[in-house]
């Protein structure tokens, strides 16, 4: 199913040594690379889908894999809002059953903590054995985790299931985002990475539908149905894995030119295009090697890579700081505490996920037109205002204010997914240098999950009625962190929309200031005499 690590006689044979690719083909490779870059810029979204339908299809598969991660993440938070789950695993407190804060923290924190390990491990493993085999190993872990969650009757067994399921969750995200960044044509790259975020709304949407139908039951199937349904979602993904072509970028980097050619052919490129694409990949990797040698995690922090690492990692960390963990995990529980019936809160959960999906779909049409920087920056401004108003209404505490808080949390889901919820994944896959993309993605996701782990342990003690009982007033904390995040974005976030990896390499090596990225004329543009506006940059 995968590829071994033994280099073969390369395609073409004269460039078998991957460290001498650029030298062996010389100016010919560079000319082909620049020409293909210009062709990519001229291609529209619909042309890319029509000419490379299989590349588009396998990007969709990588997006589908992300549904597994969002499904399990949402299931862990949603079960807290199911009365029967609190009864089976919790204790009686002031007229209702409450899950102990320590176990609530453990259920939320354990899978996020193991996802950190999964993300970092996947970055290393994916570079050693390939993207496809890393997927395969992750599927084994996810099935074990689902089984333990389903059969559990004690907090300890359920905790074990959540812990094990966290490892593939981290791995799936790392590999999927890396694979999309490597396989998607330039015209589709922004849309596909933004569309990847919709997977993080589809999973919760499915969970909400299941809970709406079964959550009011008075037996264990009120919550077990959620986990059983995961078998279908995961099983379908595992079935299609056997047909997935390996990443041509990974194959070229390993010196497997013939296999890279076959992979590109399976992705929909004809014979002429295959040779051109291999030249582009080889040129890009060779130019990166001129700047640095090795592909260790430490390399992410050296020379121009450090700046790229920070810019790649920061948006995902900002996601974890701006309150999405609280909104995604505690909205249903908060609605019940605020006086809504379980059935009403389950219906509101469906509305929440529909708004999240609509927000992400909206981002597809804005991410290239508005640009990554603009959409992220102004989105954070809106989220900051929403969080501060939400906290203020929670302080008021009147019935009308409580309803207003619930409404604002729904609006938050839409705005978040239009902006930082979508752009963070585009920036992660686009900004990282080619040879370090998997490791950069691993670090970004590990840091994000570390922050989520912190919130998982802290929020129950701030939020729960038997603890600090802050409720939605925790929005003030996230609002303050959002202010700091917005300031960072204003000064340090560059615009990368419409830029090829070759152009980004050039601009980072030249240390172009962040706010000058949009207007900078690259050597590729100069050589082809194409103005910046002709390259499809965001206006």
Give short role names for the model-derived ranges.
Residues 2-269, 286-539:
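Alpha-helical transmembrane bundle of multi-pass membrane proteins
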Residues 271-286:
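Short, well-structured alpha-helical segments
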């Amino acid at each position: 199913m995968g590829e071994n690590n033994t280099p073969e006689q390369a395609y073409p044979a004269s460039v078998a040594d991957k460290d001498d690719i650029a030298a062996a083909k010389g100016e010919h490779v560079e000319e082909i690379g620049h020409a293909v870059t210009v062709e990519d810029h001229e291609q529209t979204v619909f042309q890319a889908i029509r000419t490379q339908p299989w590349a588009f299809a396998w990007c969709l598969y990588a997006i589908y894999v992300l549904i597994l991660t969002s499904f399990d993440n949402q299931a862990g938070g949603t079960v807290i809002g199911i009365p029967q789950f609190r009864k089976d695993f919790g204790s009686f407190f002031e007229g209702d059953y409450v899950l102990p804060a320590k176990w609530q923290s453990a259920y939320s924190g354990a899978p996020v903590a193991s996802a950190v390990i999964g993300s970092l491990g996947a970055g290393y493993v994916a570079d050693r054995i390939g993207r496809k085999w890393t997927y395969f190993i992750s599927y084994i872990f996810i099935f074990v985790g689902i089984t333990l969650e389903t059969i559990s009757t004690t907090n300890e067994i359920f905790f074990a299931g959540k812990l094990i399921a966290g490892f593939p969750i981290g791995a799936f995200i790392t590999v999927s985002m890396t694979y999309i960044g490597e396989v998607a044509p330039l015209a589709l790259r922004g849309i596909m990475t933004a569309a990847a975020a919709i997977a993080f709304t589809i999973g919760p949407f499915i969970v909400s539908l299941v809970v709406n139908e079964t959550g009011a039951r008075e037996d264990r199937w009120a919550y077990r149905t959620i986990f059983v349904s995961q078998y279908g979602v995961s099983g379908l993904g595992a079935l299609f894995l056997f047909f997935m072509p390996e990443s041509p970028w990974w194959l070229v980097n390993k010196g497997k030119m013939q296999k890279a050619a076959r992979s590109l052919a399976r992705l929909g490129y004809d014979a002429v295009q295959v040779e051109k694409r291999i030249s582009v990949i080889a040129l890009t990797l060779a130019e990166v090697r001129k700047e640095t040698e090795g592909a260790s995690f430490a390399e992410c922090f050296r020379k121009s890579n450090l700046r790229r690492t920070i810019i790649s990692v920061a948006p995902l960390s900002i996601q974890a700081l701006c309150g999405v963990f609280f909104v995604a995990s505690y909205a249903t529980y908060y609605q019940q505490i605020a006086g809504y019936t379980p059935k009403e809160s389950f219906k509101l959960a469906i509305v929440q996920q529909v708004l999240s999906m609509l927000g992400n779909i909206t981002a597809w049409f804005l991410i290239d037109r508005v640009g990554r920087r603009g959409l992220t920056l102004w989105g954070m401004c809106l989220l900051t205002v929403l969080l501060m108003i939400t906290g203020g209404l929670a302080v008021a505490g009147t019935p009308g204010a409580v309803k207003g808080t619930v409404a604002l949390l729904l609006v938050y889901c839409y705005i978040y997914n239009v902006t930082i919820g979508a752009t963070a994944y585009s920036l992660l896959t686009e900004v990282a240098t080619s040879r370090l993309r998997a490791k950069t993605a691993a670090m970004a996701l590990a840091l994000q999950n570390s922050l989520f782990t912190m919130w998982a342990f802290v929020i129950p003690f701030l939020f729960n009625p038997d603890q600090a009982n802050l409720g939605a007033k925790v929005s003030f904390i996230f609002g303050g962190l959002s202010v700091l995040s917005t300031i960072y974005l204003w000064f340090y976030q560059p615009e990368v929309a419409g830029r090829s990896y070759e152009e980004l390499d050039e601009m980072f090596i030249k240390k172009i200031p962040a706010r000058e990225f949009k207007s900078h004329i690259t050597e590729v543009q100069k050589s082809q005499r194409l103005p910046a506006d002709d390259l499809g940059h965001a206006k």
